[in-house]
UniProtKB/Swiss-Prot annotation:
Transport is among the record's keywords: no
NCBIfam families, A to Z: glycosyl_450act (TIGR04516)
Recorded family membership: Belongs to the glycosyltransferase 28 family.
Catalytic activity: dTDP-beta-L-mycarose + erythronolide B = 3-O-alpha-L-mycarosylerythronolide B + dTDP + H(+)
Alphabetical GO biological process terms: antibiotic biosynthetic process
Organism of this sequence: Saccharopolyspora erythraea (Streptomyces erythraeus)
Catalytic class of the enzyme: transferase
Enzyme Commission number(s) of this protein: 2.4.1.328
Comment field (misc): It does not require an auxiliary activator protein.
Protein name: Erythronolide mycarosyltransferase
GO function terms (MF aspect): hexosyltransferase activity; UDP-glycosyltransferase activity
Disulphide-bonded residues: none
């Protein structure tokens, strides 16, 4: 069958789609990836066939006032301490309004939707798999008669909050049932003769790649697949080609955005605290310029994460799904300094399961970070629990093993 994957131009979101794309390809299906032009190199680098459509989004160009409105509903979504607030009608409606006004129309811009629909109508895929913010994929699927599903790269917050919102909305008086996402999707789909249905918001089904302990209960039809982290095309550097008898720690992701790395002096103090660790610390990604670093700290712009973590005792990161999944896959303890979207939740879940420590970015400092590192490295129960989570993840079917199920669902939903 013909399978079309689609994602707005966000490299790490796309990377979460790659293992299933290749599973479908090696099963004999014709697979193409339609995305905004900025993603083309990443698609080609994954060895997949790219179809550039539309113009690039400008999500990260939104003005600070608008960003603040969006962040209210996407930062510090603390399920452990804000549960009542997060499930209130006011919060759920506010989230639907903010994302449907300032996020979804921006990443699904008019030219992207129109050209994606044109391509789908011409190529006639049997199945469209879409990244969960890329609602253009659902519209294109309905416009050409294809089956369609969301391919989740992380925690299903969109489906979870949409389900809670709809449950409360339908209990309200008929004259007071606003639906910002439904209104926006009705307008977008209507341009192509497609009527709104809830499947445009949540797919006809979803593919969830998180292990059982981390899945959110959405009540929606879901196909479970094993998380197989893909970190992008890469080359192993010389210093990483051979194993090392020295213990390693990895620090990656958004370091420069934390208060403990606000400037070169603060960054240097943070590194000095971490350097007390008996072993090598590999710091990846950009940070403030510093003239000197301790001898046991290696600063690198990029490193193949899957290769590095094979020989790491722990990782400190920002909670991103790809980094988290790679650490999970290798069974190492994780220290998450996270607050964005689903990053906080996974960090808290990992900590609750005894496989790591969660730290709030607005509270962490060099001392607390160094203390957490010592704790997860010196206490063997963290590694033991991380290995248990790895084993749990390995119990899920591989992407290749779910292909027959996707074929069956495609036959059921097509047309």
């Amino acid at each position: 069958m013909r399978v079309l994957l689609t994602s707005f131009a966000h490299r790490t979101h796309f990377q979460g789609l790659v293992p299933l794309a290749w599973a479908l390809r090696t099963a004999g299906h014709d697979v193409r990836v339609a995305a905004q032009p900025a993603l083309t190199d990443a698609v080609i680098g994954a060895g997949l066939t790219a179809v550039p459509v539309g113009s690039d989004h400008r999500l990260f160009d939104i003005v600070p006032e608008v960003a603040a409105q969006v962040h209210r509903y996407s930062f510090y979504l603390d399920f452990y301490h804000r549960e009542q607030e997060l499930h209130s009608w006011e919060f759920l409606l506010g989230m639907q309004e903010a994302t449907s006004r300032w996020v979804y129309p921006v990443v699904n811009n008019d030219s992207f939707v129109a050209e994606l629909v044109d391509f789908a109508r011409d190529w006639r895929p049997d199945l469209v798999l879409w990244e969960p913010f890329t609602f253009a994929g659902a519209v294109a699927a309905r416009a050409c008669g294809a089956a369609h599903a969301r391919l989740l790269w992380g925690s299903d917050l969109t489906g979870y909050f949409r389900g809670r919102f709809q449950a409360q909305r339908l209990r309200r008086p008929p004259e007071d049932r606003p639906d910002p996402l439904g209104t926006w999707l009705t307008e977008v789909a209507g341009r192509f003769g497609v009527e709104f249905g809830e499947d445009l918001a949540v797919g006809q089904w979803s593919v969830d790649q998180l292990p059982p302990s981390f899945r959110l209960d959405t009540g929606m039809e879901t196909v479970v697949a094993r998380t197989l982290p893909y970190n992008g095309a890469s080359v192993v550097p010389d210093w990483l080609k051979k194993g090392s008898a020295t213990r390693r720690i990895c620090i990656t992701g958004g370091f420069s955005g934390l208060g403990l790395a606000a400037d070169a002096d603060q960054f240097a103090r943070t590194l000095a605290q971490l350097a007390r660790f008996d072993g090598e610390i590999v710091v990846t990604g950009s940070g403030p310029d510093t003239s000197a670093v301790p001898d046991n700290i290696r600063l690198v712009d990029f490193v193949p994460m899957g290769v590095l973590l094979q020989n790491c005792a722990a990782i400190i990161h920002h909670g991103g799904a790809g980094t988290w999944a790679t650490a999970l896959h290798h069974g190492i303890p994780q220290i998450s300094v996270a607050h964005e979207w689903d990053c906080m939740l996974r960090g808290q879940q990992t900590a609750e399961l005894g496989a790591g420590i969660y730290l709030r970015p607005d509270e962490v400092d060099a001392d607390s970070l160094a203390s957490a590192l010592t704790q997860v490295v010196e206490d063997p129960t963290y590694t033991e629990n991380a290995v248990k989570l790895r084993e749990e993840a390995l119990s899920d079917p591989t992407p290749q093993e779910i292909v027959p199920r996707l074929e069956e669902l495609t036959r059921r939903h097509a047309g």
